[in-house]
Amino acid sequence: MLETYHFMKKYYYLLITIFLLASCEEDIKFNTPAFQSLKDNVFWRAQNYSAQAKAGGGVYISGGLGTNVVTLKLPSLETKTYVLGVDNLTAASYSDRFAIDKPEFTTGTNKGSGQVVITEFDNNKGTISGTFKFTAVNTNAEDLENPSVTFTEGVFYKIPYTPLVNFNN
């Protein structure tokens, strides 16, 4: 009887081990395309994103999560580092489109700071990739509760790019 017990115990442990190994699986999710960052040190990932040509040249790269939108405005598609807070040609903004007080945060000439780096622009596939970080100032100077918002470790990866459509043939 004792031998049968030890024999069954071995098979029991073997079955548990096989079950545990068989139930382990790797669920790999690819986040392509992606637009994400840390917003005031809290993970923020856009559910929708786009990159669109501006009429005067350059591009708007946007990511939205619900009613919140981050927009990066760049003067060109050249792969390089763009410094924020120097002029209004290169800017970053964050807004909540449907909030009651509609807070809006932006960088611009002597306002806010940061950088956007375009690491890749694939004209054939129509995608743009890069990184960003910025601190944007509240456009409402009277809002002392929220003077600024900070985005760090930002990444936009293979965002679909829409070139400017010219209807004049």
PLM feature segments, named:
Residues M1-F7:
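Short, Lys/Arg-enriched N-terminal segments with co-localized hydrophobic residues
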Residues E25-D27:
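Bacterial signal peptide processing site
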Residues K9-L14:
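Sec-dependent signal peptide recognition
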Residues F121-N169:
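C-terminal or internal capping secondary-structure element at the end of a domain, subdomain, or sheet
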Residues F35-K39, F43-Q47, Q52-T127, V137-T139:
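Surface-exposed helix/loop patches within compact recognition domains
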Residues T32:
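Acidic, metal-coordinating catalytic segment for phosphate/diphosphate chemistry
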